[in-house]
Each structure stands twice: as C-alpha cells, then as structure tokens.
Amino acid sequence: MQRSTDRILTTHVGSLPRPPDLQQMLQAKDRGEPYNASAFEARVKQAVAEAVRKQVEVGIDVVSDGELGKSSFTNYVKDRLSGLDAVNPDPYPGPPPIFPEYASAIRIEPGRVTAAGLGVRPLNTDKFGWKNFSEVERDIANLESALQGVEYTGAFLPAVAVGQVLFMIPSTYYTSDRAYLYDLADVLKREYCAIVDAGFVLQVDAPDVPMMRNRQLWNVPFSEYRKHLALRLEALNHALEGIPEERVRFHVCWGNTEAPHAEDVPLKDIVDLVLTVHAQAYSIEAANPRHAHEWAIWQDVKLPEGKILIPGVIDSVSTFVEHPDLVAQRIVQYARIVGRENVIAAPDCGFGTFSAWAPRVHPEIMWAKFRSMVDGARIASARLWGSCASAPSATGARTSP
C-alpha cells in the first residue's frame, strides 16, 4: 500500500454514481426481472473504464472500479453466495425515531425505517457458499482492463465485511451470530484473497461497526454492544488471516445518508476495537458536521506504528463543494498529530451506495468535490513538505498497489 512519502495522496471510498442506463440494468437484475446479460456485462466493463479514466483525470491517486457492477456494497452478495435465495419481507429495523415529526414528514413509519431504496433484501435460509464466483473475477478483470495504459499510483477493490452482511441480512438457518459470522468469514475469505492476489488493495466496508448500536442494539447496555462488535471484528480477522496487513484498508462510517445522526456512536468509544482489525489503513468518516470534530481524538489515541489514516475530508452526502483551503486544513490537522506520511485524503464515504437510489450528490458536483480534494491535498503538501513537495498529477508514475 502506498504512503504519503513526499506529498499527501488522495483516494476515494469505493462506490461512484452509476450511469443511468447501467443503473436501470442493475435494478432489473436485482429484482430478478429479465435483462440482457451480455449487454449488461459489456456496459459494466465500459463504465469501469470511463470511471477509472475520470478518476485519473481529476488527480485521484488510488483509484477503484466504483463498484459499478454491484447493486450495493452489501447486497451484491445475494447474486454470488448460496444460502441467500429467499427475500426478507420485513422492514429495515430501527428504534423509534427521536425526531418523529421529521420522520413522519419524510414518510418513515414510526419505529421502523422502510427498506425503500435499498433494493431487494435477501434472507439467509441455508449454509453459506459460493454459487457465482465469476462475478468477483469479472470485477477484478474489469479493473485490470481499465488500468491498461493508464498511469496511476495505486488501485483498490472494495468487499463487504462479514459483520455488515449480518447487519443487513438476517438468518433462519444459523442458530447463533458466531456460527453465521465464522461460516461467512470462511466463504468471503476467497473473495478477499482473490482481490489481493490480483495485486489490488482490499478495502473492507464495515458501516455496521457503529450503526449496529443505533439500528439493532439500541436497547441493550453499551458494554453489550461492544461485545457484539468485538465478535464481528474477531470473525473479520479470521477471514483476513494470512492476508498481509499492508494490502488491507478498513472503512468505517455511520451510514451514508443526509440525516440528523444525533445518536451516532462517538468514535472515541469504539476506536480501540476498530484498531484491532488486521489492516494497515483505516478509512473513517470525518468531514460531515457530526464527526468533523473527531480529528482531536488522535491527540489521545496513538495510531499504531506503521498504520495509515484515511480521514474523510469532503462530505459524501452534501452538495456543498468544499473549499480547497478547508480540505487542506483538515489534512494538516491529522498530519500534525499522526505524521504526514500516515495520512491519505478521501471522502467520508461512497457516492453511489445503492443502485436503487438516485445519487445524493449529482456526478457533476461529485467530480468538482474530488477536484477540491486534490487541490486541498496539494496545498496541504506544500504546508507539510514545503513548496518543493511533489504535485499530484494525472500522469504520475504508476507504482504497485
């Protein structure tokens, strides 16, 4: 994995808005409706190539496929794993809303958030296994193809964390969370290894880490939530066993939605568990109004030797285009605490979380935000290394992922 050795590197967090025609294909596929499979595969490959080219053009250093061939960052597993053929008819769980008038105004049933916009939600009814590993191989091949002839610094592919699958997909088959998690870990390990073996950095997506508290375990003591969280991360480490930490980055966020977030778990209360994950880099939401202050916890929490922080420096749900000077300030705050070589700049989260959602941030605005992030990283680099810091460039030398 690259470090910011002579300037602040930039990346993003995986999902990008899908072109409208591809979005329609993904929605049909997700719902089990007829679609042209060969046209879909060709369009995904083309879209990935376009997305990679655009990432390089705006100056992003560590690029990805944008998850353009997936219905979502979690539920894509239903097309690939056995044991997920049933449909979950229940609404998305959640506590009674703390802002009931607001909840009513946006048509959320009191006590439960509907699954609208999440696509088809599967239900686990049998032992996990692979039924369609070729889709993993397709994702790898599409990114490999898109990178041909493109000069880039690094590349990554996202995959879902074992705990996030449990967060989204309940089971009528497994009799305990432990059995579910460890069985799934043994299965997902194959995907994790394939990404790393292809030469890419593996990004493991785990918004369940904080979200399980206020979506599933809001009515238990905080200590009990931490026990559940520790089990999920233990199972994830089981899946990551044997994979070099320097090939893994771990993404944590509080739900990629423009919502009050008034009861989000503070990072300070879970950061010790987050740092137990066998990854070199930790991608953490840090730009939005609820979590922008949390840079300060790193004054008291020591980032372990050799680790990297990938803080969010632009908001992924707001159409405000951050000023490059603000981005630079955020980067410098982190760099002066954990070391400039240990910081890579990124958005808070992805910009195309679910294919069933219209993009929360229009692609035109997203690319403008990315340009501000790149410009901010250049300003921060000059402040941290001096005016001779290497400038980010779309034609910079390609190094190993």
Task: Tell where the protein language model's regions lie, with residue ranges.
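Domain-level signal for soluble alpha/beta catalytic cores
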Residues: M1-P401
